[in-house]
């Protein structure tokens, strides 16, 4: 990137995450016909390479995060034009132009692209980065600490942490994990534990828990337990980071939901897909363990919730000022009470103010005691 005079680390990191998503999907679903890579000047073009990447990205977002990405592939155009009648030519072209103008985003633009010359400059950068990773396998059947550490390095350098968005250090995640009676919980449950982090950020808690399972379970048992790990993240970029991170650590089965964990269950489970991926995954009283470091002191967060969502909380009442209330940590506590079953455990990092403030904090303490 420095060679090509690209200094925007955050944008570069975002694009790198998208590239990793493409490669992870390709390795998982196209093992016998890999599409990730540049196949040489005699067999490929920059446009075709990016077309394949966009297709992989669309499929990866649908499969891993339940998100629908607008992308018009060469196959889509070929299929429609084969059936085209002259009188519909204008309408079809208008629809394609509308999608490309208003609904698509260049998910692989390390440089700003708004003409052919800039497209070719960016394509050269993209080709070189794709070639860097094409011959390496990102998805593993077992933990690959090197790949995990590599991605952690990219994360620390490429994503700025500021007020309200701090990643939980791995050491803190491990300390909390060691404090839990995990072996006892596993032995008491005949089925895999359903585990959730409802503010998963970059996925540190999820990956630490998944790694800790290796102390108690066989390789055959691990995959089933991974399938019962859920992370919810409201920030779009971080939801993608969490999915890539889990794959890098060899834990690709972990479920990441791009959603607002405080929304009503119907809204939190909504996505643009049909069938199996659209089925609700977060239900009340359905989890055995919650581990999280949710945000705190977020002014006006209630304004982002629908009336239906707000009314699912006992803490919400007419006396609360929706515009100024910042007690988001209290609502995360009540949400924990809603999604955990009667025998569940919760390990949540909270500000000390939850122990001594009055008003809504007093009501939150009552929920915790109950």
Show which residues each predicted segment covers:
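Non-catalytic accessory regions of SAM-dependent methyltransferases
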Residues: 1-39, 351
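Amphipathic alpha-helical interaction segments
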Residues: 11, 15-19, 128, 145, ...
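Long recognition/docking surfaces used for binding and targeting
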Residues: 21, 28-156
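Class I SAM-dependent transferase core
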Residues: 148-172, 177-178
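Conserved S-adenosyl-L-methionine
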Residues: 166-277, 281, 285, 289-292, ...
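Short amphipathic alpha-helical segments
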Residues: 243-244, 302-305, 360-362
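Mobile active-site "lid"/loop adjacent to the S-adenosyl-L-methionine
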Residues: 296-331
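Conserved Class I SAM-dependent methyltransferase catalytic core
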Residues: 321-370
